Amino acid sequence: MKKITFIGTGYVGLVSGAAISDFGHRVICADISKEKIRQLNNGSVPIYEPGLTELLKKNISAGRLNFTYDIKKAIRDSEIIFIAVGTPEGKDGKSDITAVKSVAKVIGENINEYKVICTKSTVPVGTGNLIKSIIKEHNFNNVPFDYVSNPEFLREGSAVKDFLWPDRIVIGSENKKSLNIMKEVYDPLYINDKPILSTSIATAEMIKYAANAFLALKISYINEVANLCETLGADVQDLSLIHISEPTRRIE
């Protein structure tokens, strides 16, 4: 059983934190918003996702899942820290990683023993190096740590199912120590015989963007097919069932 903190209680942080606590780990979900933490502690879930409310209640009752706005203490009390804050698109079309950088600074200032720092947020390739440098800059006692990237592949409407029954888990790491620690986090998924795919940090960061781009490509494809069907008098519903029902062509 690991002691884990998720910084950020938005869509990714809340779903991931609840699901990982269901694996048997002790999880703290931390956020700077006192109001959001108050609501969560009172049983109010700020987002709707099928199965999430039940998952939260189950693990809160079991004592495995807690919420706090004391991010500094949550960092000190954990072995693994997941960065799960938002990275919204800015006016220039680029991801705004201001919150990620702020979290890295707080981690550096409060790291008190060896920890694994893991990014769940979708971040541009190369952000891992920036996070490491910020932590080191503020880690005045030179406490050792490892950094890993563990991108999420959650779909709205089936996020809980996607996390508990994934088709793969991607971990980007720099050494076996941090990789093995992350494998222990996902140990229960071995029961489902799901592969843990190990790669470099940069590749893990890129995989998320590649997956998003491929999804956009598939959606564009079926839209073009639908337009052709309308022009030619073909039935796009039947076509979808026949042609895209084959797993390698499925729109997901």
Where are these regions (language model features)?
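Conserved Rossmann-fold dehydrogenase catalytic segment
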Residues: V148-A216, D238-L241
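Glycine-rich, N-terminal phosphate-binding loop of Rossmann-like dinucleotide-binding domains
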Residues: I83-V85, S121, S173-E174
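Rossmann-like NAD(P)(H) cofactor-binding subdomain of soluble oxidoreductases
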Residues: P88-F153
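Alpha-helix C-terminal capping/helix-to-coil transition sites in glycosyltransferase folds
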Residues: R76-D77, E113, P166
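A short helix-to-beta-strand connector/capping loop
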Residues: L56-N66, N141-F145, N192-K194
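Single conserved hydrophobic/aromatic residue that forms the stacking wall/gate
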Residues: I242-E252
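A structured beta-alpha segment of the ubiquitous adenosine-cofactor-binding alpha/beta core
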Residues: L52-E79, E89, G108
